[in-house]
Amino acid sequence: MSKSLIVYGSTTGNTETAAEYVAEAFENKEIDVELKNVTDVSVADLGNGYDIVLFGCSTWGEEEIELQDDFIPLYDSLENADLKGKKVSVFGCGDSDYTYFCGAVDAIEEKLEKMGAVVIGDSLKIDGDPERDEIVSWGSGIADKI
């Protein structure tokens, strides 16, 4: 059985809800899921026997890209994670009225690619409140690529 880790940072609860929907999609595909708030994860956990690691982070800020506050320490130390060759995927919530819609998703994905991680599927950028069907469908597509 494949094993996955979903790490999320959430301020208003939207990204946490999205992470739960992704977990639901993975469980429907009989993939073992660990769902963790970013505050409960260290970089050492990320390469720890998982077939895929998913990162969920909301975007804040109007003038520049701002990651969700709790996610920043993990993002800043991500280079220390053993993710070379590891399958990863990224999702997040944002607001398309802002200049950098879901910029955190792009920033995380770019950093992971530079580290040699293998990004599978397109990232998911959620505009506003998460919609279950859209997210479960995306998660199922990612799960099929493991």
Curated annotation (Swiss-Prot):
It holds the Pfam family Flavodoxin_1. SUPFAM superfamilies: Flavoproteins. Its cofactor is FMN. Keywords: Electron transport, Flavoprotein, FMN, Transport. InterPro entries: Flav_short, Flavdoxin-like, Flavodoxin, Flavodoxin/NO_synth, Flavodoxin_CS, Flavoprotein-like_sf. Residues 4-143 form the Flavodoxin-like domain. One of its GO terms (molecular function) is FMN binding. Low-potential electron donor to a number of redox enzymes. Belongs to the flavodoxin family. This is Flavodoxin. It comes from Maridesulfovibrio salexigens (strain ATCC 14822 / DSM 2638 / NCIMB 8403 / VKM B-1763). The lineage of its organism: Bacteria, Pseudomonadati, Thermodesulfobacteriota, Desulfovibrionia, Desulfovibrionales.
